[in-house]
């Protein structure tokens, strides 16, 4: 986060793009593809596709069934299109962001935490006015066995829960903004990821503590049409959150969600 904030301060040009140190661009033409679309549609935020990889072998494209966003959709309708097609996800590096949005420090990343992209993407969604998406694979997202997304500790899960609480507080502080409703499915997905991670915490007392706090936000599951989240909602109604955690643990300790940035 500190490196990103430093880069934001040093950035020039009209748009800002992030790339994590262990990821890489798909090919040498990706910036041309981004630039061409930005010149055509002039959005505040352009989202793009990415490919998962272990560094050697491609593991599949993230958005497999959605083509590029049709040109001509009104700015006020663009975020609804993005959310209805499950294209708004918690990562900074699959987006090109108009640099003007970073003025006054409104889009600084919170430092010294994990999962910092979650609340940042929510704040970005509330701040930007127009959105676009291209189906081109721009980034190769590398998943290592030692990466944060492949390991679970109590502190990391607690930070994920704190991020969800932060997002809920942000939405509670927004008045008369229809985008709040559009962002509830986004929080629902983070909540589903939280449940999967809680199931992987080995210490039962720590798991119980996390689940006790997580119960306050279980109603967000009702806002998502994502198949995984709908299954969690059904399970929570049938066997409660504690039973849902047990089911996730049985299903390879929550691997249903491992690396699932969609």
Positions of predicted regions on the chain:
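Donor-binding/catalytic cores of nucleotide-activated saccharide
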Residues: 3, 21-131, 141-155, 175
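Amphipathic alpha-helical repeat scaffolds of TPR domains
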Residues: 184-196
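A structural signal for short, well-ordered beta-strand segments and their strand-loop junctions
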Residues: 47, 133-134, 181-182
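Glycine-rich, basic loop-to-helix element that forms the pyrophosphate-binding segment
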Residues: 1-11
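Membrane-interface aromatic/basic loop that binds lipid-linked glycans or pyrophosphate carriers
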Residues: 40, 200-262
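Catalytic core of nucleotide-sugar-dependent glycosyltransferases
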Residues: 136-144, 150-178, 193-197, 201-221
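All-alpha amphipathic helical-bundle segments outside canonical DNA-binding/catalytic cores
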Residues: 177-185
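Short aromatic/hydrophobic "clamp" motif used to bind/position activated sugar donors
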Residues: 16
